[in-house]
């Protein structure tokens, strides 16, 4: 592993431990050249995924892009980072275990919306407004109507 401080490849693992849900291994490392300490995370990747965009272009799946888009939807919402990370892991696992190497962006969007709907209504509506390309207030009314029809609490779900 390359040291982020000096760029040396001469690093050593000082501590390894699984995260709470055991889907990721956290490693504390030290650079033997400059003594800089840093943390890395290791997770299992079942398969390389390719995303088929709406315009037909194919791009490699980017987990970080998924995290960023969810962080935007969840901004200023009472959802802990741990819950976000767990949801991302669940989504990625579902995509990887689908058996498909190529996955449409629409499929990813639907899976994300399904997970957000169970987690936080406000984040769900925010994500839906971008994903479904809302153009007018009526679009918001439709989604809000769907949520109230479910009869579920309209805040953060436990």
From Swiss-Prot:
Role noted for this protein: Negatively regulates transcription of bacterial ribonucleotide reductase nrd genes and operons by binding to NrdR-boxes.
Domain ATP-cone: 49-139
Stored NCBIfam families: transcriptional regulator NrdR (TIGR00244)
Cofactor note: Binds 1 zinc ion.
Tagged with keyword Oxidoreductase: no
Recorded GO MF terms: ATP binding; DNA binding; zinc ion binding
Location of region: Disordered: 1-20
InterPro entries: ATP-cone_dom, NrdR-like_N, RNR_NrdR-like
Source taxon at top rank: Bacteria
Pfam families, per database record: ATP-cone, Zn_ribbon_NrdR
PANTHER family named among the record's database cross-references: TRANSCRIPTIONAL REPRESSOR NRDR
Swiss-Prot/TrEMBL cofactor(s): Zn(2+)
Species of the source: Afipia carboxidovorans (strain ATCC 49405 / DSM 1227 / KCTC 32145 / OM5)
Keywords, ordered alphabetically: ATP-binding, DNA-binding, Metal-binding, Nucleotide-binding, Repressor, Transcription, Transcription regulation, Zinc, Zinc-finger
Gene: nrdR
Sequence similarity: Belongs to the NrdR family.
Protein name: Transcriptional repressor NrdR
GO biological process: negative regulation of DNA-templated transcription
